[in-house]
């Protein structure tokens, strides 16, 4: 059986100083060239990705054009928009590479919904800033229209709306994603952590929240029974005591040791810690599961064991 891999692309893979579609597509073109050897391998591949800058721009556009005739779309719908947009860009560049290689593989995007628990305590403590900055006066007006919304000051730059970041419970499209990935298809899924939804009677309803991309990627990898979760970030390896005089590079580590480092506070919250927590969950989800954390440039070398941080039981 060919190895099945979920590749979680970090925001740096599609980040650019310019926010134009052309600039972002150029960044994605460069990024996908780094994954070309993986596309040429027999591995079955699912790609997840972030959407922070893109959904931020969408929310600003929605706010600025909001009117009776062009009402602003809610966060869950903007999440779907960003999945389609970034998925389209990724498809275009991956298809270009597959054509150059004369490959018979195909690529496609699944707009992905992620179930969350409406009773998740994280809903009581929204922390994820989204959308544009507002003045104090603007916030006072907004809260008349949105009494349940929470706004917090953001490092002296103004006020921003904050939403919850609940844990993913299930990926609604995981069976479809698995079926496609088990063929010759490269699947793009769980963009931006997926669209958070809650079960309501006999259907699902979108909620105003943002799911951590690494947690969503771990849940997806577990549900489709992937062998490897590869988390691509902006560093080649995981370090303990990062940016300190006594920083130490990790090349290979077991989960038991990793848990000790987590308990000792060796990883920064909001940056490496969620990746480490996702790695632990995936490795513990079944036998012979492994996680690789590295940067985009070393993805293939890491997969064959030459680079990156390798996490296992």
Swiss-Prot record:
Its main location: cytoplasm. GO terms for molecular function: ATP binding; carbamate kinase activity. It is found in: Cytoplasm. It catalyses: hydrogencarbonate + NH4(+) + ATP = carbamoyl phosphate + ADP + H2O + H(+). GO terms for cellular component: cytosol. GO terms for biological process: arginine deiminase pathway. Keywords: Arginine metabolism, ATP-binding, Cytoplasm, Kinase, Nucleotide-binding, Transferase. It is an enzyme of class 2 (transferase). Its EC number is 2.7.2.2. Pfam families: AA_kinase (PF00696). Pathway: Metabolic intermediate metabolism; carbamoyl phosphate degradation; CO(2) and NH(3) from carbamoyl phosphate: step 1/1. Belongs to the carbamate kinase family. This is Carbamate kinase 2. It comes from Staphylococcus aureus (strain bovine RF122 / ET3-1). The lineage of its organism: Bacteria, Bacillati, Bacillota, Bacilli, Bacillales.
């Amino acid at each position: 059986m060919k190895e099945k891999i979920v590749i979680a692309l970090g925001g740096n893979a599609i980040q650019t100083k310019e926010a134009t579609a052309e600039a972002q597509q150029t960044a994605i073109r460069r990024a996908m060239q780094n994954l070309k050897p993986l596309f040429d391998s027999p591995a079955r591949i699912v790609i997840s990705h972030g959407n922070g800058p893109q959904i931020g721009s969408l929310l600003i556009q929605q706010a600025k054009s909001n009117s009776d005739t062009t009402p602003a779309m809610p966060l869950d719908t903007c999440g779907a928009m960003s999945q389609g947009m970034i998925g389209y860009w990724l498809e275009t560049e991956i298809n270009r590479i597959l054509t150059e290689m004369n490959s018979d593989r195909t690529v496609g995007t699944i707009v992905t919904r992620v179930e969350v628990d409406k009773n998740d305590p994280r809903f009581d403590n929204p922390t994820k800033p989204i959308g544009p900055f507002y003045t104090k006066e603007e916030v006072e007006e907004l809260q008349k229209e949105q009494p349940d919304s929470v706004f917090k000051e953001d490092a002296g730059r103004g006020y921003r709306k904050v939403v919850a970041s609940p844990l993913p419970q299930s990926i609604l499209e995981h069976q479809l994603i698995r079926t496609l990935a088990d063929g010759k298809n490269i699947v793009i899924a769980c963009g931006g952590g997926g669209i958070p939804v809650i079960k309501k009677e006999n259907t699902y309803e979108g909620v105003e929240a943002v799911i951590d991309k690494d947690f969503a990627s771990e849940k997806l990898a577990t549900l489709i029974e992937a062998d490897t979760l590869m988390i691509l970030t902006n560093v080649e390896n995981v370090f303990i005591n990062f940016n300190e005089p006594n920083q130490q590079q990790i090349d290979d580590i077991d989960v038991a040791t990793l848990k000790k480092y987590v308990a000792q506070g060796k990883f920064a919250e909001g940056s490496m810690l969620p990746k480490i927590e996702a790695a632990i969950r995936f490795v513990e989800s079944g036998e012979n599961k492994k996680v690789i954390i590295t940067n985009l440039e070393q993805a293939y070398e890491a997969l064959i064991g030459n680079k990156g941080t390798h996490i296992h039981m």
